[in-house]
């Protein structure tokens, strides 16, 4: 992603946090690739003013931190009302009402870190990515080119990290559901009888 500088600098402890910009996934992807926390906000939560516009209808600021505690601390500072709208397409346009950051944010982001904060939330994890879908990648001629539609063999060290993450989510009150992933199956034809985007 285009925010790799922010991601790698934060991961290497060159700074306590980084500020990336995202249009598609260029804020989240560097965080995922460097083991960081990232937050992609809704429109108006973090001011975009002053950033280089790539696609003004999609651009958002994405902070990077090494821990969730750091992220919550940072959000308490950077999620603030910005009275100046020049340079911020969404807050400047008159047709879609964008609430002020103060109307959306909690009194304290740090207060969100309690043990039951995910109670009632459900996370869906595609079985094909955690070696739990025996049909994934078994089509006679899978995919639409390149490695698409082929079996994903996730290595044991990543599965161990997944199991730790799953335990943490459940401990925080979340429900974790292992599920199929029709978007990939029906696009890439990854199993016998599955269509592809070309069919």
Range-by-range predicted roles:
Residues 187-199:
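Charged, often glycine-rich, active-site loop that binds/positions anionic groups
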Residues 1-29, 64-68, 72-75:
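Active-site-proximal alpha-helical scaffold in enzymes
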Residues 10-11, 30, 40, 114-119, ...:
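Extracellular/periplasmic catalytic domains that process cell-envelope and extracellular macromolecules
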Residues 157-172:
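A short alpha-helix/helix-coil micro-patch that ends at or immediately precedes a cysteine
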Residues 23-49:
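Glycine/threonine-rich beta-strand-loop-alpha-helix active-site module
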Residues 175-182:
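General small-molecule cofactor/ligand-binding pocket signal
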Residues 40-160:
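A short helix-breaking turn/cap at a secondary-structure junction
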Residues 24-28, 60-61, 130-134, 184-188:
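Flexible loop/turn segments at secondary-structure boundaries
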């Amino acid at each position: 992603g285009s925010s790799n500088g922010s991601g790698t600098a934060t991961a290497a402890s060159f700074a306590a946090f980084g500020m990336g910009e995202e249009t598609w996934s260029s804020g989240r992807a560097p965080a995922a690739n460097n083991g960081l926390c990232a937050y992609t906000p809704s429109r108006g939560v973090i001011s975009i003013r002053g950033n280089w516009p790539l696609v003004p209808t999609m651009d958002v600021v994405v902070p990077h931190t090494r821990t969730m505690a750091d992220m919550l601390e940072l959000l308490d500072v950077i999620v603030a009302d910005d009275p100046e709208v020049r340079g911020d397409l969404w807050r400047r346009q008159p047709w879609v009402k964008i609430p002020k950051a103060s109307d959306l944010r909690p009194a304290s982001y740090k207060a969100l870190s309690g043990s039951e904060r995910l109670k009632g939330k459900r996370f869906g994890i595609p079985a094909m990515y955690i070696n739990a879908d025996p049909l994934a990648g078994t089509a006679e001629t899978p995919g639409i080119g390149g490695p698409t539609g082929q079996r994903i063999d996730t290595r044991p060290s990543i599965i161990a990290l997944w199991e730790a993450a799953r335990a943490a989510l459940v401990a925080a009150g979340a429900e974790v559901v292992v599920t199929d992933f029709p978007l990939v199956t029906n696009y890439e034809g990854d199993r016998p009888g599955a269509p592809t985007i070309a069919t």
